[in-house]
Amino acid sequence: MTLLGTALRPAATRVMLLGAGELGKEVAIECQRLGIEVIAVDRYPDAPAMHVAHRSHVINMLDGEALRHVITEEKPHYIVPEIEAIATDTLRELEGEGLNVVPCARATQLTMNREGIRRLAAEELGLPTSTYRFADSEASFHDAVAAVGFPCIVKPVMSSSGKGQSFIRSAEQLAQAWEYAQQGGRAGAGRVIVEGVVKFDFEITLLTVSAVDGVHFCAPVGHRQQDGDYRESWQPQQMSELALKRAQEIARHVVLALGGHGLFGVELFVCGDEVIFSEVSPRPHDTGMVTLISQDLSEFALHVRAFLGMPVGAIRQYGPAASAVILPQLTSQNVTFDNVHAAVGAGVQVRLFGKPEIDGTRRLGVALATGENVEEAVIRAKKAVSRVTVKG
């Protein structure tokens, strides 16, 4: 039984978002639809989810004392992390004191960095992964590359959106790759993972929901990556029945091992009928923004329904759909979007995130489209993006 109070009243049900970006914004909107009181927290003011929250706070979420203070002040019933860069030791302490961390503090801690989740998947669960080594100094980094071999990929153990990642083809790139990885970590310089390159036909995100009525799967989401970040995603990604079954088995093992209720973005490589585990996020996934147009329940609605203890039931997928990101490069604290009217139309939507500023390249929005097939949907989404002019 789920009892929900009314926002801004004594019996209000309160949800605190740790991270208030575009994904958190959609989670906040789903909470608002249920009359839930929303508190958004991030490291900078006027973050997207703060626009649709009842209150907001600006703190360094890696500062355990500051994190504990804001949680103690607001007394949320549900603490919902949106990003990895959080003082997860503090979350475990707070969970031990009776607070509800979504999906659970252990999941946020294990997935905060690539080492925790890789060791769980490969060494504890025995799931197929790429070859890998970890390194915490430049010397051990060279040893790790020698063990894995060329070509390989180096990533900070904690980073997002491709920051700090390099594709290494030769020894001449090692010094630059190490330095770039040290600059790109979400918690500053430190440990890296060196991964062997996996041969694959395509990558998918299998959005997997762990709820009171069991584990549920969305149709697989295909996506194209560039510079470590996604550019387009589409649903459904066509794959063999055997590969889909194996992907679902891997995802089920991972989410049940992590524990708790919520939506998980399980990233997988697919080569023919073979499936290899890549990463998992215990929260909605950026490639899953396509579900805003492709499903009756978006990944955000599913996440909220699951962590509130409600059954998910069946997930209806409407048909071929795609997303394409609006990713301008400029510097401005007063961004405007021109020609949006030419981008939207029947079966085409535009979502602008409301980020307060840009300094370089930043994802500021997404176009969503349906089509007769995924190829057409991707073309329509990309065409919509091309029609939007970002100014500053």
From Swiss-Prot:
Enzyme class: ligase
A cellular component term, taken from the record's GO annotations: cytosol
Pfam families from the UniProt entry: ATP-grasp (PF02222), PurT_C (PF21244), RS_preATP-grasp-like (PF22660)
GO molecular function, one term: magnesium ion binding
Residues the entry annotates as binding ATP: R114, K155, S160, S161, G162, K163, G164, Q165, E195, G196, V197, V198, E203
Binding of Mg(2+), residues: E267, E279
Keyword rRNA-binding assigned: no
Known EC number: 6.3.1.21
Signal peptide positions (record): none
Keyword terms of this UniProt record: ATP-binding, Ligase, Magnesium, Metal-binding, Nucleotide-binding, Purine biosynthesis
Single biological process term from Gene Ontology: 'de novo' IMP biosynthetic process
Catalytic activity: N(1)-(5-phospho-beta-D-ribosyl)glycinamide + formate + ATP = N(2)-formyl-N(1)-(5-phospho-beta-D-ribosyl)glycinamide + ADP + phosphate + H(+)
UniProt pathway annotation: Purine metabolism; IMP biosynthesis via de novo pathway; N(2)-formyl-N(1)-(5-phospho-D-ribosyl)glycinamide from N(1)-(5-phospho-D-ribosyl)glycinamide (formate route): step 1/1
Positions bound to N(1)-(5-phospho-beta-D-ribosyl)glycinamide: E22, L23, E82, D286, K355, R362, R363
ATP-grasp domain sequence ranges: 119-308
Cysteines engaged in disulfide bonds, as pairs: none
The protein's assembly and partners: Homodimer.
Function in brief: Involved in the de novo purine biosynthesis. Catalyzes the transfer of formate to 5-phospho-ribosyl-glycinamide (GAR), producing 5-phospho-ribosyl-N-formylglycinamide (FGAR). Formate is provided by PurU via hydrolysis of 10-formyl-tetrahydrofolate.
Similarity field: Belongs to the PurK/PurT family.
PANTHER family: FORMATE-DEPENDENT PHOSPHORIBOSYLGLYCINAMIDE FORMYLTRANSFERASE
Protein's recorded name: Formate-dependent phosphoribosylglycinamide formyltransferase
Organism, as annotated: Salmonella typhimurium (strain LT2 / SGSC1412 / ATCC 700720)
Gene that specifies this protein: purT
